[in-house]
């Protein structure tokens, strides 16, 4: 039953690499958003930007999990 899980990992790998690039972009956005929210705490949009960046950082793991669980066994 567990032999198809590596197949899902291999199929999802190119998408995970794209998600990894987005995660790096998210890390940069998170750093910029955190600095800007410290400079101007009255702007709530910077906090929302930082939360969006954290979601981008978690994206590669979510993509791999989705592909691994999508392969029927």
From Swiss-Prot:
State the tissue distribution. Confined to the vasculature of various organs, including seedling roots, leaves, cotyledons, sepals and petals. Also accumulates in root hair cells.
Return the GO cellular component terms, semicolon-separated.
Answer: extracellular space
InterPro entries assigned: TAXIMIN_1/2
Description of the deletion phenotype: No visible phenotype.
Q: Which domain of life is it from?
A: Eukaryota
Alphabetical UniProt keywords: Developmental protein, Secreted, Signal
Instruction: Tell me where it resides.
Output: Secreted
Task: Please report any disulfide bonds recorded for this protein chain, giving both cysteine positions.
Answer: none
Asked if the keyword Amino-acid biosynthesis belongs to this entry, the reply reads no
Signal peptide from the UniProt entry: 1-27
Purpose: Signaling peptide involved in the regulation of lateral organs separation.
State the protein's name: Signaling peptide TAXIMIN 2
Organism (species): Arabidopsis thaliana (Mouse-ear cress)
